[in-house]
Amino acid sequence: MTDVPTSAPRSTSKSEFSHETVLLFETVAAVLGEKSLNDNTPKHDGNYVDATFGRGGHSKLLLNYLSDDAKLFVFDKDPEAIDVANDLAAEDKRVIVVHDSFADMTQCLNSRGVSQVDGIMADLGVSSPQLDDGSRGFSFMRDGAIDMRMDTSRGQSVGEWLQTVDEETLADVLYDFGEERHSRRIARAIKGMTQYTSTLELAEVIKQAHPKWQKGKHPATQSFQAMRIFINNELGDIDSFLAQSLTLLAPQGQLAVISFHSLEDRRIKQFLQRHSRGQYPEDENLPMPPQRPRYFSKPKRIAPSKAEVTVNNRSRSAWLRVATRTDTPYNTDPSPQHS
C-alpha cells in the first residue's frame, strides 16, 4: 500500500499560495464508509466524486484507498483549481476532471456514462489560496479588484454588480447571505462610494459604517461573505447539489460535506433530517399514519480535533456532516408512502 501522509498535503498549485486541507482524514474515511484510515484499510472499487477539488488535498488522500479500476471525478469552477486537477489527472488515470459547478453534477456525470456513484465529498466555501490571493477579491485584508467570482472566466464580478445594484437590494443581500444586522447602514455607505475598484477601500467603508465591532472579528467579514455567496449563487448550488445526491448515490453510498458557517451547515442539517427521519403527517386520527421514505441513515456531525484547530486556525469553524444512502429508491412523488 502507498504510504499514507501523516498531515494534510501541501498544495501543488503553480501559485505561491498554499492550502491546509480541513478534516482531511475524517472526510476521506467517511466517504469510504470507514471508521478510520490505516494500513489495513481495503482498496475500494467504484465511482467517487470530489465536488470541490480546490487544491486536491482530499482527492489525493482518497486515491490511496481506491483500487486501480476505481474512478474519481473531481469538480471545480475555479480555473486555477482545474489547472492543479489536470496535473493530477496527468499522473493518475483514475482522475477525471470536470470544470463545472457541482450544481450540474448529474448532467456532467451522465454525459460521461455514469449514473450512480459510491461516495460524494464536498468542502464548501472559499479556499485558502483564494483568500490569500488579493487579486481574486475575496479578502478584506489584501488589496485587489472587487471580483469574488469562483469562476473568473464567466459571470459578473461583485465590483460590476455594486455599480448597478440599488441600496435596498444590497441591504437585503447583506442581511440574507451575511446575517449582517447593520445591513441598511452598511449598504448606504457602500452606495455612497464613487468607484468600486479596491477591496481594501470597500472594507474600510464597511468598517467605518459598522456601529459595533465584534472583538477578534473584522467588521467587513459578514458583508464580504454575503456578496461572495450572492454573486456565486452558493446557497442555490448547495441545494441543487444535495438534491442530486439522492439520485446519484448508490445504495449504501456515502455523503460527506464540510461547511464553514451557519447558512451552509443549516441547509445540510435540514436536508439530512428531512430525508432520514421518515417524517409522519400530523394526523392523530389515522390508525397507522403513512411514513415518508428514509433516503439517508446514520447522519452525524464531526468537528475538527483540538490538535487540528491549533495547527490550522481556519478549521475552527468547520463542521463535517456525513450520512449513508439507504437502499430505498428515490421517489419524486411528494405524497407519503404507506408502510
What residue spans do the PLM features occupy?
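S-adenosyl-L-methionine-dependent methyltransferase catalytic core, i.e., the SAM/SAH-binding region
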Residues: M1-S339
